[in-house]
Amino acid sequence: MKRKIYIRMTLVSVIMMLFTMSVTVFTFYNLFSEQVMEDLKTHVHILNTTEAVLQYVEKDFDPKIDNLRITVIDTKGDVLYDSNADIGTMDNHVNRPEIKEALEHGHGEATRKSDTLDKTTYYYAEKLENGQVLRVAKEVVSVWQFIFKILPI
C-alpha cells in the first residue's frame, strides 16, 4: 500500500514539475520574442534617422558584429541591399507580410522561417521618406532549442 502511494505521489510530483517548467519556459520565450521585436523596432528607428541609410549600411554596417540582417527594398519589392545574402538570387519581396504592411501603413512585422537563410527570423520593416522600405531582421532559436539550452543535461 505504501509503495502505491509513493509511486503515485512521485508521478504527480513529476507531472507538476514538468507542467510548471513548460509554463515557465513558454512564458519566458514569449517575453523574449516580444523583446526581440522591440529591439528590432529600435534599430530601425535609429537607422531611419541616419541621413543616407543605404550608404551607411553598405559602408559601416557589419552583420557579424551587430548580429542583425538589414535589407533595403524599393517600392516595387526589389531588394536593393541585403547584409546577409546575394541580392541577385533573392525573390521580389512585395508580397512579404512585413513589406506589405510597411508599404501600406508605414511599418510592419512578421516572424517566419526565412527562405533565404533557412532559419526562424523576426522581421520589422519601416517605410522611409523616399518610399523605400528598411527591414531589420534577427535570427532566434526555436522554443525547443531554448528548452534544451536551459536543461541541465
Go through each PLM region and give its residues:
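Short, well-structured alpha-helical patches and their helix-loop capping segments
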Residues: 94, 115, 135-138, 147, ...
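A structural microfeature
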Residues: 80-81, 132
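Short, hydrophobic beta-strand elements of compact beta-sandwich sensory domains
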Residues: 122-147
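Extracytoplasmic/secreted envelope proteins and their assembly/folding machinery
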Residues: 41, 96-99, 140
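Juxtamembrane segments flanking the first transmembrane helix
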Residues: 1-78, 84-91, 104, 145, ...
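Membrane-proximal, non-catalytic sensory/regulatory domains of signal-transducing membrane proteins
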Residues: 64, 89-130
